[in-house]
Amino acid sequence: MKIYFDNIDFNSCSGPNSFGTKLASELEKNGHRINKDKDPDIQLSFIQAAQKLAPVVQRLDGIYFNSEQDWELLNKPIRQTYDLANGVVFQSEFNKTLTEKYFGKKEKSIVIHNGTDLEYISKIPELNDPVINKFDNVWSCASSWRPHKRLSENVRYFLEHSGDNDCLIIAGNNPDYQIKHNRVFYVGNLNYPQLISLY
């Protein structure tokens, strides 16, 4: 089958792009052609369609629901693609339930969680760092931080429930909550192998 991956950056490791790259790799291993033809059999549009070349399946990992934003305006292009799509692939049951509450149910939909290549992960060495190695347990969280990702809640939970010799490592851009604490470390953006090494 010829499949066009729409609105995806195979060079990015953000959530939808990372999922798309892994999915494309698996589909190619199974004999499908990805983004190589001008006349695809099907188009997989990530979040919203940039164009329409074939029947559309939408890959959706969430919709906007932050009441402090104009969520209806932000959801407009996502909703347009949802209405256009012949089917929808949701990232999670939560996402499916939330989307169907606001957009209505789709006749053809499925939940496919973000998978990963366990063989690839097994080849990544564990993080070995003299500062981190002195702790009994390493807690971690990573995101492209935005208010609804609740970084402050992550830190609060860690401080309330961690042991005295545990640390928290926070990875990702734009942390919207920062605290100076001898067991909390901000490491910025990490690439995929670095994140796996940390975990």
Residue ranges of model-derived segments:
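Carbohydrate-associated surface elements
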Residues: 94, 115
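Nucleotide-activated donor-binding/catalytic signature segment of Leloir-type glycosyltransferases, i.e.
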Residues: 172-196
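Short donor-sugar binding/catalytic loops of nucleotide-sugar-dependent glycosyltransferases
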Residues: 9, 142-147, 174, 190
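Conserved donor-binding/catalytic core segment of Leloir-type glycosyltransferases
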Residues: 128-149, 155-161, 168-169
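N-terminal pre-catalytic "stem/leader" segment of glycosyltransferase-like enzymes
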Residues: 1-42
